[in-house]
Amino acid sequence: MRFAVLFLSISVPATAQTGTLTIYSILHAVGEERYQIEPSEGALKLSTTFEYTDRGNKRTTTADLKMTGDYTPLSLEIQGRPTDVHVQAGSATVKEDTAARTFATPEKYFAIFGPSPFAVQMMLIRYWNAHGRPAHLPILRARADATPLEIELVGHDSIAVRGAMVTLDRYTIANLMFGREILWMNSNGDLAAAMTFAGGLPMEAVRTEYQSAFPQLYRSGVSQELRNLQAIGKLAPPKRTGSFAIVGARMVDATGNPPVNDSVVIVRDGRIAAAGARASITIPNDMAIVDAKGQTLLPGLWEMHIHASGVEFGPALLASG
């Protein structure tokens, strides 16, 4: 599937651009972000302030991102976190907490440390579109093994704003944090909305003038996450589907009873139909057998108070046991 996107010229704007985003946590408005993009010494400068209240605690982060006219980062300074990036003559110096590194910049790159402030992500998408939409985009980090970002244009959404229809481009971003974020951009290259996570809990941002469409965008984002989950499932398909018996494992059933050393678990259409000692379970003659001798089996799920904020958390937690 191919998508067409229209963007304005990437020349340096003659006047300042401003915007305000309303910040949500678990669908409750908790703060806002205010940003300004203006010419600065022949280049661009983004200044943004991100403020929100979390359980009575007010948190403020400010960022200054300087870029060339094609959105290539020259420096990024974030107050509220001990992080900064400076690029000069093809060399980048990055400081994160107590770590620091100086290295040659790749051919294409961006400077960003996490989901917020959201205006930095807006400039990330502008850079990505202006530089040929690379499949893997390196980010300047103190860690040499930082995973490149994977950005995809995955669809479009149309929303009604003051009686007019506005078409937004929907993106996913992987490797900025665990899982994939979802972002929407308008035709001017402005951030319309974003869905991400903070502290294991959902966090959203929406352009203030688009607030009336937030419920629609949120539903679209959830649908996109389910499509992301389907794609993950294809990467690691189950070894067995339908009906089968898992035989011979040491079963721990979380009831407080001693483990069952020679167990049988009957699965029918993805659900556990029976589980217990081999002597107590009858295996149908025509049922496929999975030999689990020497392994430990935990049938079902244990609730251990996890924050499964994104669809990627489920497969990752299952894979880790």
Protein language model regions, located:
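Contiguous hydrophobic, core-forming segments of folded domains
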Residues: 56-122, 177-188, 192-204
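Solvent-exposed helix/loop surface patches that form functional interfaces
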Residues: 30, 82-168, 215-225
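Extracellular/periplasmic ectodomains of large secreted or surface enzymes and adhesion receptors
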Residues: 205-248, 282-283
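Metal-associated gating/positioning segment near the N- to mid-region
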Residues: 287, 293-321
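N-terminal, post-signal-peptide region of Sec/Tat-exported proteins
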Residues: 35-70
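Histidine-rich, glycine-flanked metal-binding segment
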Residues: 257-298
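Short, hydrophobic/aromatic-rich segments at coil-to-beta transitions
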Residues: 16-22, 40-47, 68-77, 90-93, ...
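Bacterial N-terminal signal peptides
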Residues: 2-13
